[in-house]
Amino acid sequence: MKNGIHPDYKKFLIKVGSDVFETMSTHPAGEILMDVDFRKHPAWNKDIGNVVNQSNKSISDFNKRFSGLSFGSQKKEAS
């Protein structure tokens, strides 16, 4: 390996609320403060995704308006 061409690999702190995670990185700063907790993101937590979707007025209105709409084959009731 050539000397002087690679960035320094050092301890790096990730701070999320009161939690601190220690890892290694070449990032020039020694730490990063996260505003949003990645563990509570809807992409990683299915329960939270449902809460977010239900609280969003646009999605809620759409679901109310088209709740009876279905795709695929269904048996029609005889009249």
Swiss-Prot record:
GO cellular component entries: ribonucleoprotein complex; ribosome
Record's function text: Binds the 23S rRNA.
This protein's name: Large ribosomal subunit protein bL31
Quaternary structure annotation from Swiss-Prot or TrEMBL: Part of the 50S ribosomal subunit.
Entry's family note: Belongs to the bacterial ribosomal protein bL31 family. Type A subfamily.
Bilayer-crossing regions: none
Entry GO MF terms: rRNA binding; structural constituent of ribosome
Pfam family, any one: Ribosomal_L31
Designated gene of the protein: rpmE
A biological process term (GO) from this entry: translation
Keyword rRNA-binding: yes
Keyword annotations: Ribonucleoprotein, Ribosomal protein, RNA-binding, rRNA-binding
Species: Rickettsia bellii (strain RML369-C)
